[in-house]
Amino acid sequence: QLIIRGVTLINGDGSPPMGPVDIVVENNTILSINGVGYPGIEIKESDRPKLKKGGKELDANGMYLLPGFIDMHGHIGGASQGANPEYVFKLWMAHGITTVRQPSGRGVKEVNELKRKSKNNEIVAPRIFGYTGFGQGAKKTISTEQEARAWVRENAKNGADGIKFFGAEPEIMSAALDENQKLGLGSACHHAQLSVARWNVLHSARAGLTSMEHWYGLPEALFEDRTVQNYPLDYNYKNEQHRFEEAGKLWAQAAKPFSKHWNNVMNELIALDFTLDPTFNIYEASRDL
Protein backbone atom coordinates (compact mmCIF):
# COMPACT_ATOMS: atom_id res chain seq x y z
CA GLN A 1 0.00 0.00 0.00
CA LEU A 2 1.06 3.58 -0.75
CA ILE A 3 -0.67 6.70 0.55
CA ILE A 4 0.18 10.09 -0.95
CA ARG A 5 -0.87 12.59 1.70
CA GLY A 6 -2.01 16.20 1.56
CA VAL A 7 -1.45 16.67 -2.17
CA THR A 8 -3.32 18.99 -4.54
CA LEU A 9 -4.80 16.89 -7.34
CA ILE A 10 -5.07 17.83 -11.02
CA ASN A 11 -6.92 14.81 -12.34
CA GLY A 12 -6.74 15.55 -16.07
CA ASP A 13 -10.44 15.60 -16.92
CA GLY A 14 -10.68 19.38 -17.24
CA SER A 15 -11.61 20.07 -13.64
CA PRO A 16 -9.55 22.57 -11.59
CA PRO A 17 -6.96 21.63 -8.94
CA MET A 18 -8.41 20.24 -5.70
CA GLY A 19 -6.77 19.63 -2.35
CA PRO A 20 -5.65 18.61 0.10
CA VAL A 21 -6.42 14.97 -0.66
CA ASP A 22 -4.96 11.66 0.48
CA ILE A 23 -4.63 9.13 -2.35
CA VAL A 24 -4.52 5.41 -1.55
CA VAL A 25 -2.76 3.09 -4.00
CA GLU A 26 -2.62 -0.69 -3.76
CA ASN A 27 -1.24 -3.20 -6.27
CA ASN A 28 -0.80 -0.57 -8.97
CA THR A 29 -4.40 0.65 -8.63
CA ILE A 30 -5.75 3.89 -7.14
CA LEU A 31 -8.26 2.66 -4.56
CA SER A 32 -9.51 5.99 -3.28
CA ILE A 33 -9.07 9.76 -3.43
CA ASN A 34 -10.02 11.19 -0.06
CA GLY A 35 -10.72 14.84 0.65
CA VAL A 36 -9.07 15.58 4.01
CA GLY A 37 -9.89 19.22 4.65
CA TYR A 38 -9.36 22.69 3.25
CA PRO A 39 -6.32 24.78 2.23
CA GLY A 40 -4.57 26.41 5.18
CA ILE A 41 -6.55 24.50 7.80
CA GLU A 42 -4.98 21.80 9.92
CA ILE A 43 -5.94 18.30 8.81
CA LYS A 44 -7.59 16.05 11.40
CA GLU A 45 -5.85 12.69 11.60
CA SER A 46 -9.22 11.06 12.25
CA ASP A 47 -10.33 12.13 8.75
CA ARG A 48 -7.40 10.46 7.01
CA PRO A 49 -7.15 6.90 5.63
CA LYS A 50 -5.09 4.60 7.81
CA LEU A 51 -1.83 3.09 6.55
CA LYS A 52 -1.68 -0.70 6.53
CA LYS A 53 1.21 -2.50 8.17
CA GLY A 54 4.17 -2.57 5.79
CA GLY A 55 2.79 0.24 3.67
CA LYS A 56 4.53 3.48 2.72
CA GLU A 57 3.37 7.07 2.78
CA LEU A 58 4.58 10.29 1.15
CA ASP A 59 4.09 13.75 2.62
CA ALA A 60 3.06 15.73 -0.47
CA ASN A 61 1.81 18.85 1.30
CA GLY A 62 2.28 21.84 -1.00
CA MET A 63 2.81 19.61 -4.04
CA TYR A 64 0.66 18.85 -7.08
CA LEU A 65 -0.15 15.42 -8.47
CA LEU A 66 -1.19 14.57 -12.03
CA PRO A 67 -2.02 11.25 -13.71
CA GLY A 68 0.97 9.57 -15.32
CA PHE A 69 1.93 10.87 -18.74
CA ILE A 70 1.75 8.65 -21.83
CA ASP A 71 4.67 8.97 -24.24
CA MET A 72 3.29 7.89 -27.61
CA HIS A 73 6.72 7.73 -29.24
CA GLY A 74 9.51 6.74 -26.88
CA HIS A 75 12.54 4.75 -28.00
CA ILE A 76 14.25 2.65 -25.36
CA GLY A 77 17.36 3.02 -27.48
CA GLY A 78 20.27 0.68 -27.99
CA ALA A 79 24.03 0.40 -27.92
CA SER A 80 24.48 3.35 -30.31
CA GLN A 81 22.77 5.64 -27.77
CA GLY A 82 25.11 4.50 -25.01
CA ALA A 83 22.36 3.88 -22.45
CA ASN A 84 20.85 0.67 -21.11
CA PRO A 85 17.07 0.25 -20.64
CA GLU A 86 17.25 0.73 -16.87
CA TYR A 87 18.70 4.24 -17.29
CA VAL A 88 16.07 5.21 -19.87
CA PHE A 89 13.20 3.80 -17.80
CA LYS A 90 14.26 5.69 -14.68
CA LEU A 91 14.52 8.95 -16.63
CA TRP A 92 11.00 8.43 -17.96
CA MET A 93 9.60 7.58 -14.54
CA ALA A 94 11.36 10.55 -12.92
CA HIS A 95 9.64 12.84 -15.42
CA GLY A 96 6.18 11.37 -14.79
CA ILE A 97 5.94 9.08 -17.82
CA THR A 98 4.19 5.92 -16.69
CA THR A 99 3.22 4.48 -20.09
CA VAL A 100 5.28 4.43 -23.27
CA ARG A 101 4.68 3.24 -26.82
CA GLN A 102 8.02 1.88 -28.07
CA PRO A 103 7.99 2.28 -31.88
CA SER A 104 10.61 -0.17 -33.18
CA GLY A 105 14.31 -0.35 -32.50
CA ARG A 106 14.86 -3.27 -30.17
CA GLY A 107 13.54 -6.65 -31.29
CA VAL A 108 10.10 -7.94 -30.36
CA LYS A 109 11.47 -10.66 -28.04
CA GLU A 110 13.55 -8.19 -26.03
CA VAL A 111 10.73 -5.65 -25.81
CA ASN A 112 8.28 -8.36 -24.75
CA GLU A 113 10.64 -9.42 -21.97
CA LEU A 114 10.98 -5.84 -20.72
CA LYS A 115 7.20 -5.44 -20.96
CA ARG A 116 6.69 -8.61 -18.92
CA LYS A 117 9.13 -7.50 -16.22
CA SER A 118 7.46 -4.09 -16.01
CA LYS A 119 3.98 -5.63 -15.73
CA ASN A 120 5.16 -7.94 -12.94
CA ASN A 121 6.96 -5.10 -11.12
CA GLU A 122 10.30 -6.87 -11.52
CA ILE A 123 11.88 -3.64 -12.83
CA VAL A 124 11.21 0.07 -12.33
CA ALA A 125 9.74 1.00 -15.70
CA PRO A 126 6.66 2.46 -17.37
CA ARG A 127 4.01 0.22 -18.90
CA ILE A 128 5.31 -0.68 -22.35
CA PHE A 129 3.46 -1.11 -25.64
CA GLY A 130 5.87 -2.55 -28.20
CA TYR A 131 5.58 -1.81 -31.93
CA THR A 132 7.85 -3.87 -34.20
CA GLY A 133 9.51 -2.25 -37.21
CA PHE A 134 7.79 -3.59 -40.34
CA GLY A 135 9.83 -6.46 -41.75
CA GLN A 136 12.08 -6.73 -38.70
CA GLY A 137 13.21 -10.32 -38.27
CA ALA A 138 12.13 -11.38 -41.77
CA LYS A 139 14.54 -13.70 -43.57
CA LYS A 140 14.39 -11.54 -46.70
CA THR A 141 12.95 -8.25 -47.89
CA ILE A 142 9.15 -8.34 -48.00
CA SER A 143 8.26 -7.95 -51.67
CA THR A 144 4.73 -9.35 -52.08
CA GLU A 145 1.34 -8.82 -50.48
CA GLN A 146 1.32 -12.43 -49.29
CA GLU A 147 4.68 -12.00 -47.56
CA ALA A 148 3.43 -8.80 -45.94
CA ARG A 149 0.34 -10.49 -44.53
CA ALA A 150 2.35 -13.48 -43.32
CA TRP A 151 4.83 -11.21 -41.51
CA VAL A 152 1.98 -9.28 -39.84
CA ARG A 153 0.43 -12.51 -38.58
CA GLU A 154 3.79 -13.69 -37.25
CA ASN A 155 4.33 -10.34 -35.53
CA ALA A 156 0.98 -10.68 -33.76
CA LYS A 157 1.80 -14.28 -32.83
CA ASN A 158 5.07 -13.06 -31.28
CA GLY A 159 3.10 -10.83 -28.91
CA ALA A 160 3.72 -7.38 -30.39
CA ASP A 161 1.20 -4.62 -29.73
CA GLY A 162 1.54 -3.14 -33.20
CA ILE A 163 3.74 -2.23 -36.17
CA LYS A 164 5.96 0.75 -36.95
CA PHE A 165 6.12 1.45 -40.69
CA PHE A 166 8.54 3.65 -42.60
CA GLY A 167 6.95 3.12 -46.00
CA ALA A 168 6.90 0.44 -48.67
CA GLU A 169 5.34 -0.26 -52.05
CA PRO A 170 1.68 0.87 -51.95
CA GLU A 171 0.29 -2.64 -52.43
CA ILE A 172 2.46 -3.95 -49.59
CA MET A 173 1.41 -1.13 -47.26
CA SER A 174 -2.26 -1.78 -48.08
CA ALA A 175 -1.96 -5.51 -47.46
CA ALA A 176 0.00 -5.15 -44.22
CA LEU A 177 -2.34 -2.53 -42.76
CA ASP A 178 -5.41 -4.53 -43.76
CA GLU A 179 -4.08 -7.68 -42.09
CA ASN A 180 -2.95 -5.76 -39.01
CA GLN A 181 -6.37 -4.12 -38.66
CA LYS A 182 -8.08 -7.52 -38.87
CA LEU A 183 -5.93 -8.67 -35.95
CA GLY A 184 -6.84 -5.60 -33.89
CA LEU A 185 -3.29 -4.31 -33.43
CA GLY A 186 -2.08 -0.72 -33.52
CA SER A 187 0.04 0.87 -36.23
CA ALA A 188 2.27 3.90 -36.64
CA CYS A 189 4.15 5.29 -39.62
CA HIS A 190 7.15 7.54 -40.05
CA HIS A 191 6.44 8.38 -43.69
CA ALA A 192 10.05 8.43 -44.84
CA GLN A 193 10.89 10.48 -47.93
CA LEU A 194 12.04 7.29 -49.62
CA SER A 195 8.39 6.28 -50.13
CA VAL A 196 6.26 9.33 -49.38
CA ALA A 197 5.87 10.49 -52.99
CA ARG A 198 3.68 7.43 -53.60
CA TRP A 199 2.19 6.95 -50.12
CA ASN A 200 1.45 9.87 -47.83
CA VAL A 201 -0.68 10.32 -44.72
CA LEU A 202 -3.97 10.27 -46.62
CA HIS A 203 -3.14 6.90 -48.18
CA SER A 204 -2.22 5.52 -44.75
CA ALA A 205 -5.32 6.86 -43.03
CA ARG A 206 -7.59 5.41 -45.72
CA ALA A 207 -5.83 2.06 -45.36
CA GLY A 208 -6.40 1.93 -41.60
CA LEU A 209 -3.21 3.33 -40.04
CA THR A 210 -3.62 4.30 -36.39
CA SER A 211 -1.19 7.23 -36.24
CA MET A 212 1.38 9.21 -38.21
CA GLU A 213 4.67 10.03 -36.49
CA HIS A 214 6.63 13.31 -36.51
CA TRP A 215 5.55 15.51 -39.44
CA TYR A 216 6.49 13.21 -42.32
CA GLY A 217 3.71 12.55 -44.81
CA LEU A 218 1.29 15.28 -43.79
CA PRO A 219 2.60 18.25 -45.80
CA GLU A 220 2.93 15.90 -48.79
CA ALA A 221 -0.79 15.14 -48.45
CA LEU A 222 -1.34 18.91 -48.57
CA PHE A 223 0.56 19.43 -51.83
CA GLU A 224 -1.53 20.96 -54.62
CA ASP A 225 0.95 21.59 -57.43
CA ARG A 226 3.61 18.91 -56.89
CA THR A 227 4.26 15.37 -55.74
CA VAL A 228 7.89 15.71 -54.69
CA GLN A 229 9.17 18.39 -52.34
CA ASN A 230 11.69 20.95 -53.58
CA TYR A 231 14.95 19.26 -52.59
CA PRO A 232 18.15 21.37 -52.68
CA LEU A 233 20.86 20.04 -54.98
CA ASP A 234 23.10 18.93 -52.10
CA TYR A 235 20.31 17.17 -50.16
CA ASN A 236 21.23 13.75 -48.78
CA TYR A 237 18.52 11.69 -47.10
CA LYS A 238 21.08 9.96 -44.89
CA ASN A 239 21.95 13.33 -43.34
CA GLU A 240 19.26 13.80 -40.70
CA GLN A 241 20.07 17.49 -40.39
CA HIS A 242 19.13 17.95 -44.06
CA ARG A 243 15.76 16.36 -43.33
CA PHE A 244 15.12 18.55 -40.31
CA GLU A 245 16.36 21.71 -42.04
CA GLU A 246 14.03 21.22 -44.99
CA ALA A 247 11.00 20.41 -42.83
CA GLY A 248 9.96 24.03 -42.28
CA LYS A 249 10.42 24.80 -45.96
CA LEU A 250 8.31 21.77 -46.78
CA TRP A 251 5.25 23.27 -45.09
CA ALA A 252 5.64 26.41 -47.21
CA GLN A 253 5.17 24.22 -50.31
CA ALA A 254 1.86 22.83 -49.03
CA ALA A 255 -1.67 24.22 -49.24
CA LYS A 256 -2.31 27.34 -47.20
CA PRO A 257 -4.06 26.88 -43.83
CA PHE A 258 -7.86 26.89 -44.16
CA SER A 259 -7.71 26.76 -47.97
CA LYS A 260 -10.11 24.34 -49.67
CA HIS A 261 -7.55 21.53 -50.01
CA TRP A 262 -6.21 22.09 -46.48
CA ASN A 263 -9.74 21.83 -45.06
CA ASN A 264 -10.54 18.76 -47.18
CA VAL A 265 -7.49 16.90 -45.88
CA MET A 266 -8.19 17.92 -42.28
CA ASN A 267 -11.85 16.91 -42.46
CA GLU A 268 -11.06 13.54 -44.03
CA LEU A 269 -8.47 12.71 -41.37
CA ILE A 270 -10.95 13.68 -38.64
CA ALA A 271 -13.67 11.54 -40.25
CA LEU A 272 -11.24 8.60 -40.32
CA ASP A 273 -10.47 9.12 -36.60
CA PHE A 274 -6.79 9.45 -37.50
CA THR A 275 -4.15 10.34 -34.89
CA LEU A 276 -1.31 12.84 -35.41
CA ASP A 277 1.68 12.16 -33.14
CA PRO A 278 4.00 15.12 -33.80
CA THR A 279 6.76 14.16 -31.30
CA PHE A 280 7.79 17.74 -30.55
CA ASN A 281 11.35 17.86 -29.27
CA ILE A 282 14.28 20.20 -28.83
CA TYR A 283 16.83 20.48 -31.62
CA GLU A 284 19.87 20.40 -29.36
CA ALA A 285 20.15 18.16 -26.33
CA SER A 286 23.29 18.58 -24.27
CA ARG A 287 24.27 18.48 -20.62
CA ASP A 288 27.10 20.28 -18.88
CA LEU A 289 29.09 17.37 -17.50
Regions found by a protein language model. Name each.
Residues 48-50, 55, 63-122, 140-146, ...:
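Metal-associated gating/positioning segment near the N- to mid-region
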Residues 88-109, 125-135, 156-168, 177, ...:
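Divalent metal-dependent hydrolysis catalytic cores, especially in the metallo-beta-lactamase
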Residues 107-114, 167-181, 222-233:
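Active-site-adjacent beta->alpha loops and helix N-cap segments on the catalytic face
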Residues 144, 161-204, 213, 258-260, ...:
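Divalent metal-binding pocket/active-site signature
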